[in-house]
């Protein structure tokens, strides 16, 4: 059993990444980390090639290596900071690019019988969403992630951790650390049930 944890902050020791790691460690499940701050992931161009070519995205960048990891995962932790009142651009780019996976192995998807629908390769996979912010709008960022991962990819959200940490280090906020540990336990329980 394996989970994939997306660490969506550009800063390696960010509060977001710390919480994602705590959740992963507490879950006790083998975890593959995708650290967006270390990768070159270009934005989706909206070319629709993935819909016509069985989910193959034509953009040659680090996202190509992430696709197989995502498909093989039994569950997910998706974490990102709130920048300018919503989820960060890095997490949004990554999320947009996961859309290609909805078209894997189904043939051309844009036709009269099934326009734009695709499949749900992440269907019912237990997922924890993580958002941090210095000042607010974490609820909006969580909603953005829920729209993409719950409504579109059909994951099963078992918990969400949305923390206002100000300019503080999350290590100094025991309640936030406890919420992250509780989320890790929920993820573990969901994966083992």
Language-model region placement:
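N-terminal beta1-alpha1-beta2 submodule of the flavodoxin-like/Rossmannoid cofactor-binding fold
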Residues: 1-104, 167-193
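Hydrophobic anchor at the start of a short beta-strand
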Residues: 31, 156-157
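Short, glycine-/small-residue-rich phosphate/pyrophosphate-handling segment
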Residues: 103-156
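Beta-strand-loop-alpha "switch" segments that mediate conformational coupling across diverse proteins
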Residues: 158-163
